[in-house]
Structure formats: structure tokens, C-alpha cells
């Protein structure tokens, strides 16, 4: 079966993802299980899309972006180079907070520019 989206050979898309027609996933990126990515999206190189993330139609995700569980982006969202989402308040390495993940909603047409952190 041929996909109607493009994934570079160095990237991974886990089972259980829904990827829209015309979407492109470039070098060294990882789209984890349960993600939904809309039509005509562009996922740059070295991007991590954690489990169950939702990206609307025509989203542009630039290089080196980390999108963590709980993030939902509307249509036409632009995520600039090296921006990151933080899905817990006050993260610490010695304390597991997986039960404290926060949902983050980014509305239609929003811009998160270069090196922005959204908590």
C-alpha cells in the first residue's frame, strides 16, 4: 500500500498514527504512536512529536521542534525553529510527573516563533 504522504527514510512514524494527505516528514524526525497530523503539513528535520499529539491541517513545524503529549494545534499553525512545549509545570529530573501532564491548545493560525518555550 502506498502512502499519500512523504516520510524521509531517516525518520520514523510509529504504528497507530494518522497522517494526512500531502504531509511531508523530513530528516531524523520521530512521530510517536497515536498522533494525528492533518493534511498538507510540513514537519522539519529533527522534530519529535510525542504520543497522542494532534496537529491540524497545513501546520508548519520547523527544524528541532519538540511537541510533547497533550499538545493540540489547530489548522495553519506555525511552530518556529527550535521551539519547545513543556507539558508539566516546574519539571525536574528526579521527580516523575507523568501523571501531571498538562494539555496545551494552540489556536488556528497561531505563530510560535524561533526558540519559544510554551509551558
Predicted region positions:
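Flexible, glycine/small-residue-enriched loop-and-beta-strand segment within the central core
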Residues: 2-4, 9, 17, 24-119
Amino acid at each position: 500500500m502506498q502512502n499519500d504522504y512523504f516520510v524521509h527514510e531517516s525518520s520514523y512514524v510509529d504504528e497507530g498514527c494518522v497522517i494526512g494527505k500531502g504531509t511531508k516528514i523530513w530528516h531524523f524526525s520521530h512521530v510517536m504512536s497515536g498522533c494525528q497530523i492533518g493534511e498538507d503539513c510540513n514537519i522539519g528535520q529533527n522534530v519529535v512529536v510525542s504520543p497522542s499529539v494532534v496537529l491540524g491541517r497545513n501546520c508548519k513545524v520547523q527544524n528541532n521542534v519538540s511537541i510533547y503529549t497533550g499538545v493540540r494545534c489547530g489548522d495553519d499553525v506555525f511552530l518556529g525553529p527550535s521551539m519547545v512545549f513543556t507539558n508539566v509545570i516546574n519539571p525536574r529530573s528526579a521527580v516523575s510527573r507523568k501523571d501531571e501532564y498538562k494539555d496545551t491548545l494552540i489556536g488556528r493560525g497561531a505563530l510560535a516563533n524561533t526558540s519559544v518555550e510554551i509551558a
